[in-house]
Amino acid sequence: MTVTEQEFLASYPQKVAPGGPTGYPGNLTAEQEQKLGELKMILLTKGYEDRTDDATLLRFLRARKFDVPLAQEMWENCEKWRKEFGTNTILEDFWYKEKKEVAKLYPQYYHKTDKDGRPVYVENVGKVNIHEMYKITTQERMLRNLVWEYESFVRHRLPACSRVVGHLIETSCTILDLKGVSLSSASQVYGFLKDASNIGQNYYPERMGKFYLINAPFGFSTVFSVIKRFLDPVTVSKIHVYGSNYKEKLLAQVPAYNLPIKFGGQSSSKIGVELSDDGPWRDPQFVGPEGLAPVAGERPTGAPSIVSNSSTYAKSTASTKVGADDKATDAKANGNGAAAAAAGAGTAAAGGAAAAAGASSSKQAAPAQAAPAQAAKAPVPAAAKTATAPAPTGKTAAPQTNSFPPEMLAMMEQNEKKAEKAAEAKTKGGAAPQANAFTDEQLAQLNSLPQQVATGGVSQPLPDSHVTQGVPTVAKIAEAAAGPHEDAHLPH
């Protein structure tokens, strides 16, 4: 069964719960209504039909503080990226069959809902073993899987959650477990997290409802207290940082029967919470015309459940893309890197494509230059250019990179060395030197760092993304890890 996007949107609530902040569907000021109408008219006049519903346009407007030209540019850049990446059909044509093996090395999963009805998303950065992961997958396929998850989140999880509570649910509750994070583990996954964050910020804005960083290393809060001054206050109010004493705080937001046992809850699964994908999106009474959510790691059917309102909707090319995925993954498993790159050309550009500014051009990427027949048959989507959206002309926002200058990285590295010495001294029974504590001079340096330390020069407040706003920021702060933990709750 297939339905149009319009029929799909009509199948679940399109207004938020009453009494919340303005700027959301069903709760707009007169000025916000006018801005929404203005943006919608511009896009419809230009021939756009899909994703011009109120909820979608309002997310882009909120991300750009209701500046219509900036929101328009951000939205149009997103549409270009979607076309180039093949996002509209990714649920039907991408097969991440190495999912189970990757999950053992980098746990990322959804599990039930919080007390406000949001899907709960969990990620364990400290458990990452990037070297082992890249024996069975590639960064490009990991990013494609990330987009697959985003699309399943939007098309299946959020609608089901909205039907449960009777009003629109647009965001997630994220738990980022930093247990085990160290300088080496953070730097291993930094490249992936940076590209993942860029995708979330630029193409899935305003998807973060609550964000919990748990098992935060000592020293993390000190740096974050500086960083947060440069972030949008609305975003900061959603972020909560805790050390090892987080259980009570998590249980205040997530019911015990929904929170995994490892975090102090009561929820478990026979196949493991990392793979179960339990939630309303698996309950037939809350599943609408979109059908049951696809299962990550299973071969896609190739049949879309939701089609475009317009006649220009990109048709599914499942047979071609799934075949290319098979060859790429099999070749990777056999250690044949060249064959994997060639066979995977139909789904991801190799090498540093993630660092290219893909959203800045509607041109397709050049075909792979390899001789293998697979590469010649499967065009390389400009899709894999996942990094950053271009800065809007005239007014302002630079690409969102969230990187740190050498001075801060040096301080963090020195800090970690102190922690190692402290641990060594404690083991030997001697007097432990002060670990993971910034000196007054270092704190002064942190406080004097310019705004681009936190934002990479972005003059607009950074938008929320569903995984996290500025994951690279978190990853770099986490480089101060290795010592005792401390609790620090960011005030609302």
Swiss-Prot record:
Task: Give the primary localization class.
Answer: Golgi
Q: Which residues form the CRAL-TRIO domain?
A: 98-271
Question: SMART domains, per this entry?
Answer: CRAL_TRIO_N, SEC14
* InterPro entries in the cross-refs: CRAL-TRIO_dom (IPR001251), CRAL-TRIO_dom_sf (IPR036865), CRAL/TRIO_N_dom (IPR011074), CRAL/TRIO_N_dom_sf (IPR036273), PI/PC_transfer (IPR051026)
Q: What are the alphabetically sorted keywords of the record?
A: Golgi apparatus, Membrane, Protein transport, Transport
Q: Name one GO biological process term.
A: protein transport
| Compartments where found | Golgi apparatus membrane
Q: Which CDD domains match?
A: SEC14
Its biological function? Required for transport of secretory proteins from the Golgi complex. Catalyzes the transfer of phosphatidylinositol and phosphatidylcholine between membranes in vitro.
Question: What name appears for this protein in its UniProt entry?
Answer: SEC14 cytosolic factor
Q: Gene name, please?
A: SEC14
